[in-house]
Design a protein with these regions (language model features):
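Secondary-structure end/capping motifs
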Residues: 254-370
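Conserved C-terminal helix/tail region of periplasmic/extracytoplasmic solute-binding proteins
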Residues: 338-458
Length: 458
């Protein structure tokens, strides 16, 4: 078979076949939200990776937040979209939409932070908060809430916080962080969804005390001097899955070659993004444009260039804040998808027992990814099932281990949980086991998004 080599950045090449089947549909619309982790879609467009696959793609900025994205994918207005990892799972279950959607690939690891305003931080500092300590726990927030309850009694007014969508990583991360210190999010707080770009304005207006969101909307408030980022989602769960590329299952079935062409282009973009920090700087220039994220380059640079801004004036080294390809970040692990299902149960979003393995194997497509990966020379992990919390670069804040074979126990082992389904009923629906295999930490594509240059293997 004839081959062509596409140069994607500083010593990295992608090998793609010139004899691949032609896409059935070439004119496409892909929706995205104005966040730095839309970068793979932007780069696939701007660097010509879509075009090289014979695709004419309109990368469309969605103004209606994640609900708008979901509705337009379900209706068919968007052929594919930037999506929260939990969204295709929820839609397939009939939560926040009702359609069989599929997660074709993971767009990135990490990328979020929990940012609080100056007023709530001042109250937390009275109870021992040291916002320069890493990672920051929610212990001081718990003490403040307890004192506030004691003072207000029956008139207790819950604190208001923001996240981007009920089935978002952000919602689960904010709850995970709070509950690890004994806070009961649904009793002690009110957690509301807001479109990501509106988080800073809602905090400044006093509508919320803080929020969990992706970049650049944490750095934006820190640079304004209106708050501080207390913890990143990397601090909560090292190298956690964040966004996916989603599509309707019937679209994937009807247009398999189009789907694979889009996947190839996006994976090439992900590899390009991690190939060098120079590539990241070029990407910042594209993301800053008004038709994409529309944020100043100096704001975007705070997280995309190997640093993160927790507190104004202090850039902290954080090379893994955004990971797009390294450490198998593009691969849609079944075990990652199932973790989101456990959180849906934990927080009372699913009211009936479901076979979690069957569900995830219906939504996540590592099988299709493996086929495409060979065509672009993307390295595959040994299995779609793995444990998290056991290796150096996938630990949880509270030391817990996520083992998909113990998924039911995992849900009910949390001291704070609001499951609507009994452990016994859920266990009956999940009488299965999987073989897990741990991938070694490795950076196949370059230094960007890599813990240390010693892990780079090309």
């Amino acid at each position: 078979m004839l081959k062509q080599v596409l140069k994607i950045g500083l010593g990295i090449s992608v090998v793609a076949s010139t004899l691949l089947a032609a896409p059935e549909k070439t004119k496409l619309k892909i929706g995205f939200i104005a966040l730095t982790d839309c970068a793979p879609l932007v780069i696939a467009k701007e660097k010509g990776f879509f075009k090289a696959e014979g695709l004419d793609v309109h990368v469309a900025k969605e103004g209606g937040g994640w609900p708008g994205i979901q509705q337009k994918v379900i209706s068919g207005e968007y052929d594919f979209s930037h999506a929260l990892a939990g969204m295709p799972i929820a839609a397939t279950l009939g939560i926040n939409g009702n359609a069989h959607l599929q997660a074709l690939l993971s767009l990135d690891f990490n990328g979020n932070a929990i940012t609080y305003g100056n007023n709530i931080i001042a109250e937390m500092e009275k109870y021992g908060l040291d916002k320069t300590k890493r990672p920051v726990s929610a212990e001081s927030l718990k003490k403040y809430i307890d004192a506030k309850r004691a003072k207000e009694g029956d008139n207790y007014a819950p604190l208001n916080f923001g996240m981007v969508h009920p089935v978002s990583t952000h919602n689960y991360e904010l709850r995970y962080w709070m509950s690890a210190s004994g806070i009961k999010p649904d009793q002690d707080c009110t957690i509301k969804p807001f479109p990501p770009p509106t988080m800073p304005s809602n905090l400044i207006a006093g509508n919320i005390e803080g929020y969990c969101v992706g970049e650049p909307w944490n750095s934006r408030i820190v640079l304004k001097g209106k708050g501080s980022a207390l913890v990143t989602n990397y601090d909560i769960w090292n190298n956690n899955p964040e966004k996916v590329l989603q599509a309707r299952a019937d679209f994937v079935e009807k247009y398999p070659e189009t789907t694979k062409a889009v996947m190839r282009a996006v994976i090439k973009a992900q590899m390009w993004l991690d190939a060098s920090w120079e590539n990241r700087e070029e990407a910042i220039g594209y993301l800053a444009k008004k038709n994409y994220v529309k944020a100043p380059k100096n704001v975007l640079r705070k997280s995309m260039s190997g640093t993160f801004l927790y507190n104004k004036g202090v850039d902290s080294a954080n090379p893994m804040f955004n990971v797009f390809a390294n450490n198998y970040a593009a691969y849609p692990f079944y075990s990652h998808g199932m973790w989101f299902v456990t959180q849906m149960y934990r927080w009372g979003q699913i009211d009936k027992p479901v076979d979690m393995k069957a569900l995830i194997e219906k939504v996540y497509r590592p099988d299709l990814f493996a086929e495409v990966a060979k065509e672009v020379d993307y390295k595959l992990p040994p299995s779609a099932w793995k444990k998290d919390g056991v290796d150096e670069y996938n630990k949880f804040l509270d030391g817990k281990v996520w083992d998909p074979n113990k998924a039911v126990d995992y849900i009910f082992d949390f001291k704070v949980q609001n499951s609507l389904v009994s452990k016994e009923d859920l266990a009956k629906a999940n009488n299965w086991s999987v073989e897990t295999k741990q991938p070694g930490y490795v950076c196949h594509y370059g230094p960007a998004g890599c813990a240390d240059p010693k892990y780079i293997t090309k």
